[in-house]
Amino acid sequence: QEIEREVLNVLAVDVFKAEINSFDGYIATGGTEANIQAIWMYRNYFVNNFDAKPEEIVIIASEDTHYSIPKAANLLMLDWLKIPVSFNKRLIDISVLEKKIVAAQTQVKKYFIVVSNMGTTMFGAVENPDDYTHILEKYKLHYKLHIDAAYGGFVYPFSNKESTINFENPKISS
């Protein structure tokens, strides 16, 4: 447990710029477990804090996201909004994202679990989490934002020192 706390501190504070003692977590066995755990935690957050029903909660992620995201949707009985990406840069189509969010609201979706990738497994694409959050905030929607950094998390923060994909961004919660 002491080693785990030390590793968490290095990752959270030194790599991802969290405030000291502002984080919690554990070392997962892999990215699949970490993603499922994050989505499970957020589903329970919405259920416990907003009395949300599972059918009111939806996961949003790109079509290039890790297979663990649709798996989590299946395990936790949540819908998944799969957002298409551009062919060349593999970045989400923001206009489709907005249309899908608007359509989800008409289908009684009130709570959004966003998974933004810090390096997709197949292409290494780094998504801008603000693309998701700007639209959700435009419509004043409740959301939680998870960064899937299983693939790029040990490279991207060091290769892009100016990145804002870290815990200095108050919108990112895991």
Locate the predicted segments by residue:
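Conserved N-terminal alpha-helix of the aminotransferase class I/II PLP-enzyme fold
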Residues: 1-31, 45, 49
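Conserved PLP-enzyme active-site core in the AAT-like
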Residues: 30, 34-174
